[in-house]
């Protein structure tokens, strides 16, 4: 298993990114300003994008695992790497996600705590 930072041609991972953020125009808002990491294990298994939101805060904008690789530990491994990588660089890492129970359970299992809900976020920002 290898995790590497992607410096260029980030759109080559668009199909994987679209699994976690279904609207390309939304991905376009953060893909270039964010840092992208890919987890490889005999092929690309997962991808993540993290942005600097200022004031010592970064946001995990997207983390996606190839469907055939779900529940094999790739998402947790990539998230664990990111938490270590950004520790000391930021005082807070936030995640905005949909309200599906499995997504929330994943983040809580990885040490995140629920903060708040933004009412109508998806209806206001997505087509």
Task: Give each language-model segment a name.
Residues 4-62, 66:
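Acetyl-CoA-dependent GNAT
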Residues 85, 106:
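Short alpha-helical functional segments enriched in proximate histidine and acidic residues
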Residues 63-71, 98:
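A short, internal acetyl-CoA/4′-phosphopantetheine-binding micro-motif in the GNAT/acyltransferase core
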Residues 65, 79, 100-103, 120-126:
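Short glycine/proline-centered loop/turn elements that form peptide/ligand docking sites
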Residues 59, 89-91, 111:
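Short loop/turn motifs at secondary-structure junctions
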Residues 86-99:
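Conserved GNAT acetyl-CoA-binding A-motif
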Residues 94-96, 108, 113-127:
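Conserved catalytic-core motifs of GNAT/GCN5-like acyltransferases
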Residues 69, 73-81:
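Conserved acetyl-CoA pyrophosphate-binding loop and the N-cap/start of the following alpha-helix
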């Amino acid at each position: 298993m290898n995790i590497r930072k992607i410096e260029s041609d980030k759109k080559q991972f668009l199909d994987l990114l679209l699994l976690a953020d279904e609207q390309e125009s939304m991905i376009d808002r953060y893909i270039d300003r964010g840092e992208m990491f890919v987890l490889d294990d005999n092929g690309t298994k997962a991808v993540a994008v993290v942005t600097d939101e200022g004031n010592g805060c970064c946001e995990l904008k997207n983390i996606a695992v190839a469907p055939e690789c779900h529940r094999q530990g790739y998402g947790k491994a990539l998230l664990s790497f990111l938490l270590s990588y950004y520790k000391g660089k930021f005082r807070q890492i936030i995640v905005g996600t949909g309200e599906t129970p499995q997504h929330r359970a994943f983040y809580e299992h990885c040490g995140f705590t629920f903060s708040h809900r933004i009412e109508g976020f998806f209806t206001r920002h997505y087509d």
